[in-house]
């Protein structure tokens, strides 16, 4: 009887996972999807409270549990919130619970993140400067990873050379990651790090050549370019800057890193699951101009996160869904940024459409994957209305393809060679773009990341095939133009 009961519950669990569109195998693309899980979000009120059981592992390839810290006396890795992290004294056992997700989701890797803003920089600077302290730290990390069965360490030292750090941190950071890498390699542990995107940081904080060499992958924090601290409105994560010399944009960061030799496949593109809030200096501002419209230098709080200048997407989308809200939705085309505003407030954020565009941007540049900071502020409960324009820009690019015959030939060629396309299809003798359809409501941003990877991959494949066919036909025409006499069939086939 006990065996039958166990079998029944196993069937129910599997049926639930499959029925709501979520499987156990994880993502079926080849990109890294790093999902940061910020432990402190469990303390947020009401629907903003996030626990480990809210994670949807099928949408991630890697989880990073944030954060643990550095003991400033022993210089060993240590937990920060014993009640949430450990099982002792009736604790919630966060370490064990998040690692246990690997048992059911075999594709998953789970790392622990060390550092973060509240940890500061001074004690990390001191540890990295001293070979003996580095050795103590690294040995403690090895023991920690083995004891709790984590797969690796994500280094979030905020930040070398700053906030109590020293200029020598740039050199000592390399010593630290080199020695960590050498210690990790025999055991297969992952070593990753989150890197700031600003030009000053990239110039003075990181020795990019060595960072690129020693880290398994680099998580580029392509967000927080602008906020209320600027005193004017701006996009949190603009793809393009406001002018050609603007260094505060994703485009500038990515070009800088690629020009300095970073390996694209080791770069992970950071995606913010949140927005930045502003309050106007005076009520009733009519026209918003990014980089010019003035604001107070402290933003307002959201109802769940309760942090000045910050609102999670799960808070913002509730305002959009609320029919009585005074906020109106807008789109800033140049930076590819959504924003909402009323007479007093302004919020720049990322929604499914801007996320889909960023996925396309990073895929075109060969990035190895994407990170979500943090999944706890996605609409993980599925409380909000589905946004209707997620793939608007993909549709517009599709509609701009003028040579439909060439497009059809490319699809036929791909179908014959690879077994068909999922999104670019021929139906009723017409080429159509079939967009991904959500099978469940929660995690709209994280779902979009995964969906857009497939869509962007197929778009590039189709365009490449069109260019290949066009080149082949041009070459054949040039070869056959003289002295061969071409037949009507050939001329018609080539569309002349």
Give residue ranges: language-model regions.
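Glycan-binding loop/region signatures in secreted carbohydrate-active enzymes
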Residues: 24-29, 114, 228-229, 235-237, ...
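Non-catalytic positions within long, well-ordered alpha-helices that form the structural scaffold/packing
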Residues: 56, 146, 211, 258, ...
């Amino acid at each position: 009887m006990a065996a039958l009961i166990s079998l029944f519950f196993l069937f129910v669990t599997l049926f639930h996972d499959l029925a709501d569109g979520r499987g156990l195998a994880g993502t079926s693309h080849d990109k890294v999807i790093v999902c940061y899980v910020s432990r402190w979000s469990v303390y947020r009120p009401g629907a903003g409270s996030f626990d480990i059981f809210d994670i949807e592992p099928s949408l991630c390839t890697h989880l990073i549990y944030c954060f643990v810290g550095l003991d400033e006396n022993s210089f060993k890795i240590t937990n920060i919130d014993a009640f949430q992290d450990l099982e002792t004294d009736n604790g919630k056992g966060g370490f064990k619970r998040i690692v246990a997700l690997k048992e059911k989701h075999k594709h998953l890797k789970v790392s622990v993140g060390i550092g973060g803003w509240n940890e500061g920089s001074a004690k990390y600077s001191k540890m990295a400067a001293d070979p003996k302290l580095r050795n103590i730290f690294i040995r403690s990390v090895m023991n920690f990873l083995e004891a709790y069965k984590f797969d690796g360490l994500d280094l979030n030292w905020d930040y070398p050379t700053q906030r109590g750090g020293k200029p020598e941190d740039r050199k000592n950071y390399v010593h630290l990651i080199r020695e960590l890498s050498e210690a990790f390699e025999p055991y297969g542990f992952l070593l990753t790090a989150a890197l700031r995107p600003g030009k000053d940081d990239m110039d003075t904080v990181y020795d990019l050549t060595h960072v690129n060499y020693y880290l398994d992958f680099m998580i580029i924090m392509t967000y927080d370019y602008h906020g209320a601290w600027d005193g004017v409105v701006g996009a949190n994560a603009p793809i393009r800057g406001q002018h050609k010399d603007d260094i505060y944009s994703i485009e500038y960061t990515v070009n800088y890193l690629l020009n300095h030799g970073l390996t694209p496949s080791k770069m992970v593109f950071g995606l913010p699951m949140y927005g930045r809030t502003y309050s106007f200096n005076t009520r009733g501002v009519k026209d918003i101009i990014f980089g010019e419209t003035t604001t107070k230098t402290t933003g307002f709080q959201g109802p769940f996160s309760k942090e000045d200048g910050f609102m999670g997407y799960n808070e913002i989308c509730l305002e959009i869904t609320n029919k009585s809200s005074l906020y109106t939705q807008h789109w800033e085309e140049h930076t590819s940024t959504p924003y909402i505003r009323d007479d007093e407030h302004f919020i720049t954020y990322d929604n499914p459409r801007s996320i889909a565009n960023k996925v396309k941007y990073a895929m075109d540049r060969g990035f190895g994957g994407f990170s979500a900071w943090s999944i706890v502020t996605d609409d993980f409960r599925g409380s909000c209305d589905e946004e209707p324009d997620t793939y608007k820009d993909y549709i517009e690019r599709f509609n701009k393809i003028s040579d439909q015959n060439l497009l059809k030939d490319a699809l036929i060629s791909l179908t014959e060679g690879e077994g068909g396309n999922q999104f670019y299809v021929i139906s009723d003798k017409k080429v159509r773009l079939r967009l991904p359809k959500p099978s469940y409501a929660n995690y709209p941003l994280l779902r979009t990341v995964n969906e857009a990877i497939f869509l962007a991959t197929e778009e590039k494949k189709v365009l490449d095939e069109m260019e290949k066919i066009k080149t082949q036909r041009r070459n054949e025409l040039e070869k056959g133009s003289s002295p061969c006499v071409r037949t009507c069939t050939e001329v018609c086939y080539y569309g002349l």
